[in-house]
Amino acid sequence: INVLGTVQMLEGARAGNIKKFVYAGSSSCYGLAKTPTTEDHHINPGYPYALSKYQGEMAALHWQKVYNLSVNSIRIFNAYGERVRTTGLYGAVFGVFLKQKLERTPFTVVGDGSQSRDFVYVSDVVRAFLAAAKTSRNGEVYNLGAGNPQTINYLVQLIGGDITYI
């Protein structure tokens, strides 16, 4: 879906004379990058989802070059807020912890919890997409995070509860 679905959307945007296509990229394309992570950081997708998101972004930017379709891409870091995912690995930690809190089970932390994540609230994601759609700039890639990475241990401390390190 991340590649073929994106290509279908790009073709639809091109056929429909859409003014701007904003691709929902992912920070996962960087792999386990040091923070802060800039847009020019080395791409190192460590698993199929990350690779497929990066390939979708490359397709969107290719349509920009080949078909002159106005495109921007936003590489979203760990989004949280209403309707947050409660399953998954890297990007779902906030939702997984909320589910564990509601179920009154210990937080499962992989490793020692010192690893950090950059979180961004869902309404900030919406604002970023609107800004990327309205800008006169095209062919741009933007990282979207709060710019203030937090450790997993700190996140658990904020939510409050017992921890099981695995």
Regions found by a protein language model. Name each.
Residues I1-E11, A15, K19-K20, S28-S73, ...:
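Catalytic helix-loop patch of NAD(P)-dependent Rossmann-fold dehydrogenases
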Residues V7, T87, G95, S123-V126, ...:
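Residues in well-ordered alpha-helical elements
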Residues C29, F77, V141-L144:
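Short-chain dehydrogenase/reductase
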Residues C29-Y30, A79-G81, V93, V125:
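Conserved sequence/active-site signature of Rossmann-fold short-chain dehydrogenase/reductase
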Residues G46, F77-Y90, G111-V122:
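Glycine-rich "substrate-gating" loop/helix at the edge of Rossmann-like oxidoreductase active sites
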Residues Q55, A59, W63, V93, ...:
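Hydrophobic alpha-helix immediately C-terminal to the catalytic Tyr-X-X-X-Lys motif of short-chain
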Residues L102-I166:
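C-terminal substrate-binding subdomain of Rossmann-fold SDR/epimerase-dehydratase oxidoreductases
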